[in-house]
Amino acid sequence: DEILHHCFKGCATQFSNYIAARSPKDFREFCIVYFSFWNENMNMLSILNKSGIMYRFASEFESLVLMMSSQTDPKANAKQKENSKYKYHFAYRTAGFWHVTELWCQEHPRKSPKEMADIMMEITSFPCGIQII
């Protein structure tokens, strides 16, 4: 367990640095960067998936996203945390995002990061185009 935790933490640090270096300006751009990172690290995702331990990375992923969101806009983040339902919204969103990643890594042929960004935009928008995430 400790070895896995160390590996996950190292990957999470790489992921965080990758996102920070690209500074996505909006949700679509974030999705492109996100799926580009995992596309470049597909071997690791495939190993996690084939060994049946990919689900264990989900909690590390949730912690990482929470940390990153607090760094990007502390004022907005503080307002969100004042909402008593914030933790439920956050858990729902990150779990959904991670599950999409799991499905995507199993695809052959795999969609490009831009195609996945388009899908994520569609998933997170109401029919009239209002962003829900």
State each model region's role.
Residues 16, 20-23, 43-46, 50, ...:
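Short, flexible helix-adjacent loops and helix caps
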Residues 23-27, 50-54, 82-86, 109-116:
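Residue-level recognition of alpha-helical structural elements
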Residues 53-80, 84-99, 129:
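Amphipathic alpha-helical packing segments from all-alpha helical-bundle domains
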Residues 1-24, 32-35, 39:
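An amphipathic alpha-helix adjacent to DNA-recognition modules
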Residues 14-21, 30, 92, 96-107:
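Solvent-exposed, amphipathic alpha-helical segments
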Residues 70, 87, 94-95, 99-133:
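C-terminal peripheral helix-coil segments that are non-catalytic and often amphipathic
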Residues 6, 30-64, 69-72:
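Amphipathic alpha-helical segments used for helix-helix packing
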Residues 3, 7, 11, 26, ...:
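Residue-level detector of well-ordered alpha-helical segments, enriched
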